[in-house]
A protein has these predicted regions:
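Catalytic glycan-binding domains that act on GlcNAc-containing polysaccharides
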Residues: 1-2, 12-63, 67, 71-79, ...
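Acidic/His metal-coordination segments adjacent to aromatic residues that form catalytic metal sites
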Residues: 83
Length: 314
């Protein structure tokens, strides 16, 4: 009871942030273990009220047997900008001709033109999203969010796009993966930027290290290999989903596999041993690397967003 009350004190009288939500959620779990389900349910309901789209609200909703949070429906109307539409056509022609630099200039002009209003920003973001230009859509979505755009599904669909949907779904299904999990992982790893390169050298949509890519390519019967292939979306999806499926087969819970994807299997196994529990929620809290801990939480939360918005559930 003392621990539960201490969690209450920390969470109920502090500014609203992720630590507050964690305190409320774990206070609920502590009260539940003490047999007071009424207080537990109150704490979990408070988490959902404060931040309905958060990781801890997702966990709380499960405890309360509620449906996960879904962004409210927004307007279906997106006002087209004739100048932007013409620029998009020019950019597509330039890209088809291999003139990527010139195409990027057109895209930059569209993004700059969209600054005049939140509505224009959202319209441009949706235009980019529809053309699988997810990184640009996300950037404009964040701009719209910071400018006061309504937090409805029209905004969230550009903040959480589903680019390369055909290849993503195909490779996810081939490896019996939840497409929403794959999309959430890519959203965190690269923002759907096929040319993304991390500071340690991971490449492509699913941020595969060249040495790992070589091993995966060999297992997938690639006759030739070049690390540059990791920048091709189809290749990244094929090898990345194979890698993720392999990790999932070796762990009891998706959170363990995500920790291994981010920090390596040797660390994930060591953390599992030190955690001393089969409870995946406790495991996540006990990951010693903040980067990996946040990584796992964000992907698990975003998986629910992708499921709710796109109906992608394996």
């Amino acid at each position: 009871a003392t621990a539960a009350r201490e969690l209450d004190t920390l969470s109920l009288h502090r500014p609203r942030n992720s630590e507050t939500l964690a305190g409320l959620y774990w206070s609920g779990r502590a009260w539940e273990q003490l047999g007071d389900s009424a207080i537990a349910r109150t704490r979990w309901s408070e988490v959902i009220t404060r931040e309905p789209g958060s990781y801890y609200a997702m966990l709380a909703a499960r405890r309360l047997h509620r449906e996960p949070w879904v962004p409210a429906a927004g307007s279906d109307t997106v006002v087209a900008d004739s100048g932007a539409v013409a620029a998009l056509r020019r950019a597509q022609i330039l890209a088809d001709l291999g003139m990527d630099y010139e195409a990027d200039l057109e895209y930059d002009w569209i993004a700059s033109r969209a600054e005049r209003s939140v509505e224009a920003t959202l319209a441009a973001a949706h235009a980019f999203r529809e053309r699988d230009l997810a990184p640009r859509a996300i950037r404009l979505g964040n701009r719209a969010l910071s400018s006061g755009a309504a937090r409805d599904d029209r905004l969230y669909r550009v903040l959480y796009p589903l680019a390369y949907e055909g290849a993503l779904t195909r490779e996810a299904e081939r490896h019996r993966l939840d497409p929403a999990l794959v999309a959430a992982l890519i959203r965190q790893e690269s923002n759907f930027e096929p040319r993304a390169t991390s500071r340690v050298g991971a490449r492509g949509l699913m941020q595969i290290m060249p040495a790992v890519g070589r091993q995966l390519a060999s297992a997938e019967d690639y006759h030739t290999w070049d690390a540059e292939l990791l920048y091709q979306p189809d290749v990244s999806l094929e090898l990345g989903t194979a890698h993720l499926a392999g990790l999932l087969s070796g762990y009891a819970h998706v959170s363990h596999a995500l920790a291994a994807y981010n920090a390596g299997s040797s660390r994930a196994k060591r953390w599992l041993e030190k955690a001393g529990t089969d409870d995946p929620e406790v495991f996540v809290e006990r990951i010693p690397y903040r980067e990996t801990r946040d990584y796992v939480r964000i992907i698990l939360r975003n998986r629910e967003l992708y499921r709710s918005m796109y109906g992608t559930k394996g």
